[in-house]
């Protein structure tokens, strides 16, 4: 209806799914202040701050020195047999596995990087035969890291 009428609407919601589905422009607020105003696609793919990355979801926030980066949960590869190719893997333990229908959310723990969430298709998960408690190699491409602002 909004698009048919061509009228600007302001829709206040706490449902992220609803906001991302309906909005042509979305505002993420923190403590009464707008911290990012962007299209839903940019909010999800290019969060400006760690708060936005964590609020929108689907990201891990990594700290390296004074800088923070967002890394999408579906950008992390898991290899139960160790590293492959030129990837520089991080060794992690599978802490939890949550089945979500066609996807599987995996919680990993590493002393260097704390907790990581990984999202993969159920097909890929079953091919890899992953289990809770298993030690695995994890990797990602450096171009999948998104630099976050300090605030």
Tell what function each PLM region has.
Residues 39, 51, 91-95:
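Residues located in well-ordered beta-strands
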Residues 30, 60, 87-88:
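Asparagine-centered polar/low-complexity signal
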Residues 35, 41-45, 53, 77, ...:
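Nucleotide phosphate-binding site architecture
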Residues 45-66, 71-74:
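C-terminal boundary and immediately downstream tail of ABC-type ATPase nucleotide-binding domains
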Residues 1-48:
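ABC ATPase nucleotide-binding domains
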Residues 68-151:
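Non-catalytic connector elements of ABC transporters
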């Amino acid at each position: 209806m909004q698009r048919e009428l061509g009228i600007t609407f302001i829709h206040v919601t706490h449902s992220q799914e609803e906001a991302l589905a309906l909005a042509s422009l979305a505002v993420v607020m923190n403590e009464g202040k707008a911290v990012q105003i962007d299209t839903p696609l940019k909010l999800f793919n290019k969060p400006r701050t760690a708060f936005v990355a964590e609020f929108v979801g689907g990201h891990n926030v990594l700290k390296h020195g004074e800088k923070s980066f967002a890394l999408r949960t579906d950008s992390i590869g898991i290899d139960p047999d160790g590293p492959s190719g030129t990837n520089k893997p991080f060794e992690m333990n599978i802490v939890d596995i949550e089945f979500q229908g066609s996807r599987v959310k995996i919680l990993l723990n590493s002393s260097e990087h704390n907790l990581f969430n990984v999202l993969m298709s159920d097909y890929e998960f079953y091919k890899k035969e992953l289990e809770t408690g298993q030690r695995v190699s994890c990797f990602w491409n450096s171009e999948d890291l998104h630099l976050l602002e300090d605030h």
